[in-house]
Amino acid sequence: TPNSYILQQFENPANPKLIVAIFPSFGER
């Protein structure tokens, strides 16, 4: 599911840009 995929990206430091792309406010911290 998309949700589990997003959770996997949270646990994977190799994809910080994907996290920022999904959560722009997350990248501002």
Swiss-Prot record:
Catalytic reactions on record: O-acetyl-L-serine + hydrogen sulfide = L-cysteine + acetate
Example GO molecular function: cysteine synthase activity
Cofactor: pyridoxal 5'-phosphate
Disulfide partners: none
The enzyme's E.C. designation: 2.5.1.47
Pathway: Amino-acid biosynthesis; L-cysteine biosynthesis; L-cysteine from L-serine: step 2/2
Highest taxon in the source lineage: Eukaryota
Family: Belongs to the cysteine synthase/cystathionine beta-synthase family.
Name of the protein: Cysteine synthase
Species whose genome carries this gene: Populus euphratica
